[in-house]
Amino acid sequence: ISKRKKIIKNYFYNDNFYRNLLKKKKNNRLKSEYSKIKKYKKMIKFVYQDSPKGTGDAVLRCKNLINSKYFLMLMPDDLIINNNCSHSLIKLHNKFNSSIIASRKVNKKNVSRWGIFKIKKINKRNFLINDVVEKPSIKSAPSNYAVIGRYILPKKIFRILRKQKPGLNNEIHITDAIRTLILQKDKFIGHIFAGKYLDCGSMKGYINSSLKISKI
């Protein structure tokens, strides 16, 4: 995160705020949520990015926190409800012993907003990823299967990111590093997840997503 975005860290560590709020409100739901925050904040580590240099740069800064051969990565502006997508990816990883990336079909008119896969179908919900392109034009897009922000990636991707040159918008993209591994014949499986997808990557998307969740 950016050092300027203190609100994210305060969400987990501002204990006085929560204690005072619970004294005033005496709300069981708030009490339950605060209990969850206390439980999980012990597991959370914060890594700072000095300037927005892309997702690849942000991931590279977490290198020293990863000890296993593979790791699970989530993009917080891609929200998936009514299904545990991460659990599904882990099951597939154990089955195929490979990297797994969540995907969904998008309107062909909107492919330039996404990373897009070139695929070879395995079954109804899974496909082999032969290539991935970051935000292609409609004409150059290899499909309309988009990258969604749930990944199981190999630790060796850090080696690629360390040497990677900036791409689109002069940023280091995780998609470009994944593409390098695919071209080196690393196996990547795409998974069309169950559940409802909510895009929180824009102010409009965030507000719409909040309204939808409030009705659940």
Roles of regions detected by a PLM:
Residues 1-3:
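Short beta-strand/loop segment that forms part of the nucleotide-sugar
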Residues 8, 18-23, 30-119, 162-164:
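Conserved beta-loop-beta/alpha segment of the NTase-like Rossmann-fold superfamily
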Residues 72, 86, 90, 122-198, ...:
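Catalytic-core segments of class I nucleotidyltransferases/pyrophosphorylases
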